[in-house]
C-alpha cells in the first residue's frame, strides 16, 4: 500500500503540472481588449505600407494597392474582383472567409459616394452576421444561459434553506458547521454576482463599435478616445470586480473545506475552534488581497470598457491564486482517497466482503469529488477550443457542474447529514406532541381518560406504556409499581421536562392513599436525576466529524 500511495502522489503531481502548464499557455476567456486589437491593426498597417512601397516600385498596375483600415489590398486587375483572406489579426472575423473588392475598367476601385469610402464586401468575414451561424450560436448560448440560470437558482434556494436549518438548531452550532455555512454563503454570493454581471455587462464588442474604432485614418487616436468618458462604466466595473472576488472566495472556501477534512484525518488532537479565524482569513481575506491588486493594475494599465474582457497577462494576478487553490485541493483529494483505500485494504485482510468495501470506497470518492471540487481540475486540463462539438459538450458540462455544485454541496453537508436529520425529527416529534396535547380536553372533564389514548397515537412506545398502565390500575398494588415507571416522554430524543404534564395524569392516580402518594413522591424525586441532562450544544450536536462525508 505504500507503493500505491506513492504512485498516487506522483501521478497527481504530474497531472497537475501538465494541466497548469497547458492552462498557462491559453487565455481563460479567449478574448482580447480593444487596446490589444488596435495594436495588432497598427502592426498590420505598418507591414502593409512596406508592401505597398515594394509593389509600386515593381511597375504600374490597374488598381493600386492600398490599406483600408482593416485589410492590405494588393494590386487589382481591371474589370475583375479581388479576393483577400479575412485577416487573422481581427479577433471577431471568420478567419476561413474572404473579403472582396472590384476593380473598375478605368483602373480604380469601386467607390461609395454615400459613405465616402471604397467599397468592400466583408460579409464573409463577419461570422456573427451570417444567418446559418448566428442562429445556431444564438440558440446554443440561450440553452447555456437557461441551464446555468436554473442551476444557480436551485443552488441559491437550497443553500438558503440549509443555512436556516443549521442556524436554527443550537446543537448544530460548531466549527465544522460554521465552515459549511461560510461555504454556503460563498456559493450564494457567487450565484448573485453572476446574475448581476449578466445584467450590466456587455460580453462582446459590437460590429459598429469595432468599425468606428479601427476604420479611422489614425487608429492610435482611438486608444485615447476610449478613455474619454469612463464614468458610464463604473457600475459594470464594480459588478465585474465583485464577480471575480466572489468567484475567488468560492474556490478558497472549497479549499478550506478540504483543509479542514484533511486535518481531521491526519492531524492528531486537531483543535478546530482554534483555527476557525484562520480559515475565515483564508476564505474571505486572501481573495480580497489579490482581487484588489488586479483591480488596481487593471485601472492603471488597461482601463477599457467594463473590464469584462481579458487584458493580457494582468489576468494572472487573480487566475494564478485560483489555479493554486484548485491544484492544492486536488492534492488533498488524492491523499484522502489514499487513506480510504488503505483502510479498505486493511479491512479486506480480516475477511470482509471485498465488493462491499470497494462500493463504499467508490461512494466516498464520489462524495469527495464534489466536496473538493475535483471537476475543476478536469476542466482546467481540457484543451481550449471555441468551435466544434467538443467545445459545446465541454461548455454544457462545465456550466452544469459549476451552477449545480451548490445544490450538491447542500445535500451532502445538510440534507443528508445524520445530525441535521435527527434534529429535524426531534422538532417534528415535539410539534406533533404539542398538537396532540392541545387537542385533548381539560383533565377535570369526564373524558380525561382520553388524554392517555390520544398520546398513545403519537408514538408506539407511549401506547405500550398506556396499555400496561390500564392493566395494573385494576389491582391496587400494581398501580403503585406502574406509577413509578419513568414518563414515556423521557425516551423521546431531545425531550425537555415540563411541569405541566403532571396536571394531565388520569384521576386513578390521585385516588391512592397518602402513604402511597408519599412513596410516589419519593420515587419521582429519585427518578428525576435519571432524565437525560441537556448537554452543551456546541459539542453534543457535532460529533463524528468525518462520518458525514466519508
UniProtKB/Swiss-Prot annotation:
Glycans are attached at residues 51, 106, 116, 121. The keyword Signal applies. It is found in: Cell membrane. One of its GO terms (cellular component) is plasma membrane. Its main location: membrane. Residues 170-176, 261-275, 338-364, 418-550 are cytoplasmic. Residues 27-145, 197-237, 298-316, 384-394 are extracellular. GO terms for biological process: adenylate cyclase-modulating G protein-coupled receptor signaling pathway; cell surface receptor signaling pathway; G protein-coupled receptor signaling pathway; positive regulation of cold-induced thermogenesis. InterPro entries: GPCR_2, GPCR_2-like_7TM, GPCR_2_extracell_dom_sf, GPCR_2_extracellular_dom, GPCR_2_secretin-like, GPCR_2_secretin-like_CS. The chain crosses the membrane at residues 146-169, 177-196, 238-260, 276-297, 317-337, 365-383, 395-417. Residues 511-550 are annotated as: Disordered. Residues 1-24 form the signal peptide. Residues 511-531 have a biased composition (Basic and acidic residues). Keywords: Cell membrane, G-protein coupled receptor, Glycoprotein, Membrane, Receptor, Signal, Transducer, Transmembrane, Transmembrane helix. Expressed abundantly in brain and pancreas. Also expressed in the testis. Coiled coil: none annotated. It is a multi-pass membrane protein. It comes from the Eukaryota. This is a specific receptor for parathyroid hormone. The activity of this receptor is mediated by G proteins which activate adenylyl cyclase. PTH2R may be responsible for PTH effects in a number of physiological systems. It may play a significant role in pancreatic function. PTH2R presence in neurons indicates that it may function as a neurotransmitter receptor. Binds to TIPF39/TIP39. Belongs to the G-protein coupled receptor 2 family. This is Parathyroid hormone 2 receptor. It comes from Homo sapiens (Human). The gene is PTH2R.
Amino acid at each position: 500500500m505504500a507503493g500505491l500511495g506513492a504512485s498516487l502522489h506522483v501521478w497527481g503531481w504530474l497531472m497537475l503540472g501538465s494541466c497548469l502548464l497547458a492552462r498557462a499557455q491559453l487565455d481563460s476567456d479567449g478574448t482580447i481588449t480593444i487596446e490589444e486589437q488596435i495594436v495588432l491593426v497598427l502592426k498590420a498597417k505598418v507591414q502593409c505600407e512596406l508592401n505597398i512601397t515594394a509593389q509600386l516600385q515593381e511597375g504600374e498596375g490597374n488598381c493600386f494597392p492600398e490599406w483600408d483600415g482593416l485589410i492590405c489590398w494588393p494590386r487589382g486587375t481591371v474589370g475583375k474582383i479581388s479576393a483577400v483572406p479575412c485577416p487573422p489579426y481581427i479577433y471577431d472575423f471568420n478567419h476561413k472567409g474572404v473579403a472582396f473588392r472590384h476593380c473598375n475598367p478605368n483602373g480604380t476601385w469601386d467607390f461609395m459616394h454615400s459613405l465616402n469610402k471604397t467599397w468592400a464586401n466583408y460579409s464573409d468575414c463577419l461570422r456573427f452576421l451570417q444567418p446559418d451561424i448566428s442562429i445556431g450560436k444564438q440558440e446554443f448560448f440561450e440553452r447555456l444561459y437557461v441551464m446555468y440560470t436554473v442551476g444557480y437558482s436551485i443552488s441559491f434556494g437550497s443553500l438558503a434553506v440549509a443555512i436556516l436549518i443549521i442556524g436554527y438548531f443550537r446543537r448544530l452550532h460548531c466549527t465544522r458547521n460554521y465552515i459549511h455555512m461560510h461555504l454556503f454563503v460563498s456559493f450564494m454570493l457567487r450565484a448573485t454576482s453572476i446574475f448581476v454581471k449578466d445584467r450590466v455587462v456587455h460580453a462582446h464588442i459590437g460590429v459598429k463599435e469595432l468599425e468606428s474604432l479601427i476604420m479611422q485614418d489614425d487608429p492610435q487616436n482611438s486608444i485615447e478616445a476610449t478613455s474619454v468618458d469612463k464614468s458610464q462604466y463604473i457600475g459594470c466595473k464594480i459588478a465585474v470586480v465583485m464577480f471575480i472576488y466572489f468567484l475567488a472566495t468560492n474556490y478558497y472556501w472549497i479549499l478550506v473545506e478540504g483543509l479542514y477534512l484533511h486535518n481531521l484525518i491526519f492531524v492528531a488532537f486537531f483543535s478546530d475552534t482554534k483555527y476557525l479565524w484562520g480559515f475565515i482569513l483564508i476564505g474571505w481575506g486572501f481573495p480580497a488581497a489579490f482581487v484588489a491588486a488586479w483591480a488596481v493594475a487593471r485601472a492603471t494599465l488597461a482601463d477599457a470598457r467594463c473590464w469584462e474582457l481579458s487584458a493580457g497577462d494582468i489576468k494572472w494576478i487573480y487566475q494564478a491564486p485560483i489555479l493554486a487553490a484548485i491544484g492544492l485541493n486536488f492534492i488533498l483529494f488524492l491523499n484522502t482517497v489514499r487513506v480510504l483505500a488503505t483502510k479498505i485494504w486493511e479491512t479486506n485482510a480480516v475477511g470482509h466482503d471485498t465488493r462491499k468495501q470497494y462500493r463504499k470506497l467508490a461512494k466516498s470518492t464520489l462524495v469527495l469529488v464534489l466536496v473538493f471540487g475535483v471537476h475543476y481540475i478536469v476542466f482546467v486540463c481540457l484543451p481550449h477550443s471555441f468551435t466544434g462539438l467538443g467545445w459545446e459538450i465541454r461548455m454544457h458540462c462545465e456550466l452544469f457542474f459549476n451552477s449545480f455544485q451548490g445544490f450538491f454541496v447542500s445535500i451532502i453537508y445538510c440534507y443528508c447529514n445524520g445530525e441535521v436529520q435527527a434534529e429535524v425529527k426531534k422538532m417534528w416529534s415535539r410539534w406533533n406532541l404539542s398538537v396532540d396535547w392541545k387537542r385533548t380536553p381539560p383533565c377535570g372533564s369526564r373524558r380525561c381518560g382520553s388524554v392517555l389514548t390520544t398520546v398513545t397515537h403519537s408514538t408506539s412506545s407511549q401506547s405500550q406504556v398506556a396499555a400496561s398502565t390500564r392493566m395494573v390500575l385494576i389491582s391496587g398494588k400494581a398501580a403503585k409499581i406502574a406509577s413509578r415507571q419513568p414518563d414515556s416522554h423521557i425516551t423521546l430524543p431531545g425531550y425537555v421536562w415540563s411541569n405541566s404534564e403532571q396536571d394531565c395524569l388520569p384521576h386513578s392516580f390521585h385516588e391512592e392513599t397518602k402513604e402511597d402518594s408519599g412513596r410516589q413522591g419519593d420515587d419521582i424525586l429519585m427518578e428525576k436525576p435519571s432524565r437525560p441532562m441537556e448537554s452543551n450544544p456546541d459539542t453534543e450536536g457535532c460529533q463524528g466529524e468525518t462520518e458525514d462525508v466519508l
